[in-house]
Amino acid sequence: MMTNLFSVFDPSAIFNLSLNWLSTFLGILMIPSIYWLMPSRYNIVWNSILLTLHKEFKTLLGPSGHNGSTFIFISLFSLILFNNFMGLFPYIFTSTSHLTLTLSLALPLWLCFMMYGWINHTQHMFAHLVPQGTPAVLMPFMVCIETISNIIRPGTLAVRLTANMIAGHLLLTLLGNTGPSMSYLLVTFLLTAQIALLVLESAVAMIQSYVFAVLSTLYSSEVN
């Protein structure tokens, strides 16, 4: 039973090549259309969303943030959002439900932030290990806690996104598997529940991509 449930997340292979991972890069095919098609309402809405994110990330980074540093977080948001939505369509591989992708995004970012902070702002990074106003007796204990919480950051970023994607898809799979054994009346309620859950999953897809990008921005602002 558990094998059948989680089989929706299995990467399929053709000629010993995991071609379904290429769905991660399908968004690249949509980029050229921006330059040779007339802007539509969708383009205007998307550009306004990106502009709002740019202003918010700029505020989070503070005055010490470098020019153009928000673009990496906006690109991260766009990549995760697109892949989250792609996974909601039938027969499309959900790449963000695998730690392979989420850890590949979170771990290099965290390592870059840590290397930059410890090399260029060593005293500032040491000061972050002890919160202001901590009694001298608790300082060694707080250093251990802050160090552990700092080390597990990329893991929590990756697991949060992966767990939310897996949970929604498992619920949809469970509801879909019970359909053939139900009467026509109950199938109507089942379809209504699945549509409501699909709307909820769309909201989760947006929220999780936003949370991932915002937390990455906050981690970046701490090393400046």
From Swiss-Prot:
The chain crosses the membrane at residues 17-37, 72-92, 99-119, 125-145, 170-190, 195-215. It comes from the Eukaryota. One of its GO terms (molecular function) is proton-transporting ATP synthase activity, rotational mechanism. The keyword Transport applies. It is found in: Mitochondrion inner membrane. One of its GO terms (cellular component) is proton-transporting ATP synthase complex. Pfam families: ATP-synt_A. It is a multi-pass membrane protein. Keywords: ATP synthesis, CF(0), Hydrogen ion transport, Ion transport, Membrane, Mitochondrion, Mitochondrion inner membrane, Transmembrane, Transmembrane helix, Transport. Belongs to the ATPase A chain family. NCBIfam families: ATP_synt_6_or_A. F-type ATPases have 2 components, CF(1) - the catalytic core - and CF(0) - the membrane proton channel. CF(1) has five subunits: alpha(3), beta(3), gamma(1), delta(1), epsilon(1). CF(0) has three main subunits: a, b and c. Mitochondrial membrane ATP synthase (F(1)F(0) ATP synthase or Complex V) produces ATP from ADP in the presence of a proton gradient across the membrane which is generated by electron transport complexes of the respiratory chain. F-type ATPases consist of two structural domains, F(1) - containing the extramembraneous catalytic core and F(0) - containing the membrane proton channel, linked together by a central stalk and a peripheral stalk. During catalysis, ATP synthesis in the catalytic domain of F(1) is coupled via a rotary mechanism of the central stalk subunits to proton translocation. This is ATP synthase subunit a. It comes from Drosophila sechellia.
